Regions:
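Extended, charged coiled-coil "stalk/tether" helices of large eukaryotic trafficking and scaffold proteins
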Residues: 1-320
């Protein structure tokens, strides 16, 4: 009976957790927000995306230009002034991107673990209770669940760290945004270069044409000014800045989407599978946690003693 009771409790928790993960808002009533797990995790991932976008380095700023200029200068004598240096590109990108990707993904992972934990606490409290005969079961089951979640977090963190390393070591994309942004920049330069070179009034045409690609007016004004001065080195630096800008947007979107899918799978759907798959095993391990309330135990023993005395009396009466 105890084993059957435990299996029923665990099966109900597993069933309802999967409902929570798939946008069922009626699991414990519409007023219980912790069990609206898909919505809670979506909030975490939306914040993760917003924070990553806000925290990424603006590679079109003057500081980046200065770093690139200094790095390119050190390579002169072997590379030409208009040459885009791959190692310099990767070094500046990685040093500015790694802390953002690492910190924001760790926050998203911790917050998702918290939301999943809150959902499971609500379900366990509902199905197993937290007093009387199920008091120890409630505590032991939550301990099991916390161990499973902690292990899942460790495994997921390892996978996310591998992703961070890949994004900061490997420079690769087939995303059209990267080539589209660079093509737009080149088009603006081609269309306006002649006017920029001969402009003596510091008012340049075309500097607003790249705003849809994130190429700000201030940046394009600086590009136009460089053409007026006539520096090949400056043009190469600006080209590299645009490449860094476009590639950072690609990585930001790619990383956020990949981490979000990974965390959802490992901390939500994989946990739902584990709860279902391990219900029988956990029921066996938790058998000793289902105990009677002390008052119930005393009453049961008293009734048993009374029953024994009654049976003894009946046997004595049967002798007459």
């Amino acid at each position: 009976e105890r084993s059957q009771f435990l299996h029923q409790v665990l099966s109900r928790v597993a069933r309802d957790f999967r409902r929570c993960a798939t946008s069922d808002t009626t699991v414990l009533g519409t007023s219980e927000k912790n069990t609206n797990l898909s919505a809670r995790v979506n909030e975490v991932m939306t914040e993760f995306a917003d924070d990553t976008r806000a925290n990424m380095r603006n590679f079109l700023d003057d500081e980046t230009q200065a770093e690139l200029k200094e790095g390119a200068k050190e390579a002169l004598g072997h590379n030409l002034a208009n040459f885009m240096h791959g190692d310099l590109f990767r070094d500046i990108f990685a040093s500015n991107t790694t802390p953002v990707l690492t910190g924001n993904s760790e926050t998203a992972l911790a917050q998702t673990r918290a939301r999943v934990g809150e959902c499971l606490v609500a379900l366990v409290s509902h199905h197993a209770g937290s007093s009387g005969v199920t008091r120890e079961l409630h505590a032991a089951l939550l301990e099991f669940i916390n161990d499973v979640l902690d292990t899942a977090v460790l495994n997921t963190r390892f996978l996310v760290q591998r992703l961070v390393k890949a994004e900061t070591v490997v420079t690769f994309t087939t995303n059209h945004y990267y080539s589209q942004t660079i093509a737009k920049f080149d088009q603006i330069v081609r269309d306006n270069a002649n006017g920029w070179r001969h402009n003596h009034h510091a008012h340049y045409d075309g500097v607003d044409d790249g705003e849809d690609e994130g190429l700000s007016r201030d940046f394009m004004h600086s590009v136009a000014h460089d053409f007026h001065i006539g520096s090949n080195e400056a043009s190469a630096i600006r080209q590299m800045q645009v490449s860094l800008h476009a590639y950072s947007k690609v990585v930001q979107k790619r990383f956020v989407d990949t981490v979000s899918v990974l965390v959802l799978n490992e901390l939500v759907y994989a946990i739902a599978d584990k709860l279902s798959d391990d219900a029988l095993l956990w029921a066996t391990l938790l058998l000793d946690k289902v105990k009677e309330d002390e008052s119930v135990d005393r009453e049961r023993k008293k009734l048993g003693a009374d029953q024994q005395r009654l049976q003894q009396a009946l046997r004595l009466l049967g002798k007459f």
